[in-house]
Amino acid sequence: MPVASAPAVQISTATETEINEHAPTSLTVFRFADNPRILVLDFASLHEQGKMLNRVAAFVEKAGLPHDRVLTDGELDAAIRAQGDTVETFYLGHDYAAASLARFFALADSEQIMLDPAEQWLRALLQQEGWFASGVAAGLISLPAAGSDPRITASARAAILRHELSHGEFFSNPEYAEYVYKFWLTELTEDERGAVRDFLAKEGYDARVEELMFNEMQAYLMFTRDPTFFTPDMAAMTHERLATLQARFLAGMPAGWLRNVLASYQSAALAR
């Protein structure tokens, strides 16, 4: 008797505003209206988010952890505790390229790592979307519901979403990713790049992964405007220097929805 295939994951197309205003009571999957190659997982709780994505986070970008193999349950629990975190606090939002997710699941299979049901559900979603094929340019991001934790206020949720969407654009738009890389090399000084690395290392990112550094640079310096998460002094930078970098970034940025976001910030600043 043939085995029945898993039911298709339902995905709704939504704008940034619609996603931000959504109040999930269970996991909801959105396709971002301005860039359909970005999928958004909207979780009702940080626990639910962590169970699905913390092992991927450890594999892709967390400092002090291996990026060439997948952690077992025991190793992941120990790594989370060693950093003084819990399943809920390990990450507030997640972002991954299709290629990184494909590599994670391929290694988990080759190493015979027992994955949680939530991780298996994620695998099914990615298979449904065709993300395990070679050369797919796409990005998966996540965020938790407002009120799911005292830190996740309405404004914090909006900031997390904007930050993670910029990562989604980086992963799904090779032209934008190349622009960010060139900007990192040519517009920031060596000292500024070092200061950004130091800031990101303090946040738990693996500063040895260069692409991670310039991807986070664009997300924090250009699109994270909530002082709860980033202020220029965190990267040893003045407000004036950051404003100069933001203006230069906008000037050469590829056309599209994310450029419009940065332009709106600049217009609002000029109007004040």
Regions found by a protein language model. Name each.
Residues 24, 28, 33-36, 41, ...:
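Metalloprotease/metallohydrolase-associated module, dominated by Zn2+-dependent proteases
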Residues 159-172:
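Active-site recognition of the HExxH zinc-binding catalytic motif
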Residues 45, 144-147, 166, 174, ...:
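Short, flexible loop/turn elements at secondary-structure junctions
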Residues 174-187:
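Short acidic alpha-helical/loop segments enriched in Asp/Glu that coordinate divalent cations
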Residues 9-12, 17, 21, 152, ...:
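Short, solvent-exposed segments of well-ordered alpha helices
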